[in-house]
Amino acid sequence: MKTGRVLKISGPLVVAEGMEEANIYDVVKVGEKRLIGEIIEMREDRASIQVYEETAGLAPGDPVITTGEPLSVELGPGLIEAMFDGIQRPLNAIKAKAGDFITRGVEVHSLDRDRKWHFTPVKKVGDTVEAGDVIGIVQETSIVEHKIMVPYGIKGTIETIEEGDFTVVDTVAKVKDKDKVSDLIMMQKWPVRRGRPYGRKLNPVEPMITGQRVIDTFFPVTKGGTACVPGPFGSGKTVVQHQLAKWADAQIVVYIGCGERGNEMTDVLNEFPELKDPKTGEPLMKRTVLIANTSNMPVAAREASIYTGITIGEYFRDMGYSVALMADSTSRWAEALREMSGRLEEMPGDEGYPAYLGSRAADFYERAGKVLSLGSEGREGALTVIGAVSPPGGDLSEPVTQATLRIVKVFWGLDSQLAYRRHFPAINWLNSYSLYLEKISPWMDENVASDWTALRTRAMSLLQEEANLEEIVRLVGIDALSEKDRLKLEVAKSLREDYLQQNAFHEVDTYASLEKQYKMLKLVLFFYDETQRALNAGIYLKELLDLEVRDKIARAKYISEESIENIDAIFNELSEVIDELISKGGIMNA
């Protein structure tokens, strides 16, 4: 191909001339060091190139060579447990080749070309296959079975297929369609800006269980849903994302650290190999793909990292897996868009962000969903996307948050006031919402308990009433309230402190199964019902609040999953204590 020349350099933006043979979104190599870039605008023979590496040292006149291919990712065995940068370069391989610091222009394959994987066919010679059909499996980790699929655009009859140890570029099967024979390897390439095709979208009705009480009970997200976690600095966005990556009942987790601090990725690398998946008992790292594009890496690569991550997520979704993708933080991605837009001298929108911010965000989030994959087998897969948003100063009216809220169905609004009061997760139950509640409620009532939805509604109305009563208390004092209203305040406080608060760093409290959540919630509301019964029988509120059983209700969150029946004993004890109190007419142990 014809070589272009650098005309102008403006930070991560390079303008080259003599590029009439190139296409928009082609990957190019810039300068003598062959820096990786992507064409984002074409005007006659001039190409505006977004360079994914530091451009210091480039000069006008340097060569620009187009590869003729769009920015693509390699999909195949070797993705799980790997850590990539924003353009899918494996960081471990770069370290082995160039040292601790990523040198510019370093070229390494995304997937290891030397490592051999044991391929077990599930189809035989003579079988007819089409795009999306599984022809064999590779046991990638102890918990992930990597399904080798027929690439998009290929169909026909299998001519040869064999079991054995192969690298990702070795031919494992041959498919013949009329006179054309296609060699199938274990690796596929896919352009990151194009969503992977599927049969059809399905209605998401099954919740993604996260083990976080405030999320699962009040603001659930479905498998195949979209959610956002906006919040000011220090409100716990990253810890929420880490908790979801650790405990969500997805089979594959893709974690994108997009423009956040490097220490946060270090935490993931330190914790995930040690933490055990509650379902399989294996380390969490054995189902995780990490994309580290930290704040000290080039800004332009942040835009690519989001697309790289979601393409990998779609690939595992096509295998029929439930995938959870965490993007922390989409605000940094939007800032990268803003910087490139400014360099291109485009007309700015709100706060300098480009006018197309909303459509780019929609392109990303709309790639989530529950789908019926391509192929004759009809596998169901789901890709759930959860994006953190970091609005400056916690201002939720800023453009990135507003663009995100127009697209996603679940809003977990983090509140700095709750965080300052050490209430974590600091999800504000009055501001947050989930539009999946109606879809999920029948599943919860069927699979957890028939009165789940009713309990949730009661608890939510109590918290809402507490907010209204607190306004009265601020104006005229708590003594102006009736005993019934004061009881409501106490029960709402119990809901907040004993149920909604959850310690991410406590070995038991970090995760609560749906059964435990149901019993804990029912216990708090049972306390409300029993104390109301006692109040109606003439017992003083102070006596009810001084009961020792209240401490046991507060400590129920620390009961392990194996000893969950101990919560049932608290129900019986509470009922007995109230009965005794009523029969004596109050004042126990007098």
UniProtKB/Swiss-Prot annotation:
EC number(s) recorded for this UniProt protein: 7.1.2.2
Q: Which reaction does it catalyse?
A: ATP + H2O + 4 H(+)(in) = ADP + phosphate + 5 H(+)(out)
A GO term from the CC aspect: proton-transporting ATP synthase complex
Q: Name one GO biological process term.
A: proton motive force-driven plasma membrane ATP synthesis
Kindly give the PROSITE patterns that the UniProt entry links to this protein.
ATPASE_ALPHA_BETA (PS00152)
Which residues does the record give as ATP binding sites?
Answer: G231, P232, F233, G234, S235, G236, K237, T238
Q: What GO molecular function annotation could you give as one example from this UniProt entry?
A: ATP binding
Q: Which UniProt keywords apply?
A: ATP synthesis, ATP-binding, Hydrogen ion transport, Ion transport, Nucleotide-binding, Translocase, Transport
- List the CDD domains hit by this protein, alphabetically: ATP-synt_V_A-type_alpha_C, ATP-synt_V_A-type_alpha_N, V_A-ATPase_A
Q: Which domain of life is it from?
A: Bacteria
Return the broad EC class.
translocase
Q: Which InterPro entries match?
A: ATP-synt_VA_C, ATP-synth_a_Xtn, ATP_synth_asu-like_sf, ATPase_a/bsu_AS, ATPase_F1/V1/A1_a/bsu_N, ATPase_F1/V1/A1_a/bsu_N_sf, ATPase_F1/V1/A1_a/bsu_nucl-bd, ATPase_F1/V1_b/a_C
What Pfam families does the entry give?
ATP-synt_ab, ATP-synt_ab_N, ATP-synt_ab_Xtn, ATP-synt_VA_C
Keyword Transcription in annotation: no
Q: What function does this protein fulfil?
A: Produces ATP from ADP in the presence of a proton gradient across the membrane. The V-type alpha chain is a catalytic subunit.
Q: Write down the PANTHER family for this protein, in alphabetical order.
A: H(+)-TRANSPORTING TWO-SECTOR ATPASE, V-TYPE PROTON ATPASE CATALYTIC SUBUNIT A
- Family note: Belongs to the ATPase alpha/beta chains family.
Q: What is this protein called?
A: V-type ATP synthase alpha chain
Q: Which organism is it from?
A: Clostridium botulinum (strain Langeland / NCTC 10281 / Type F)
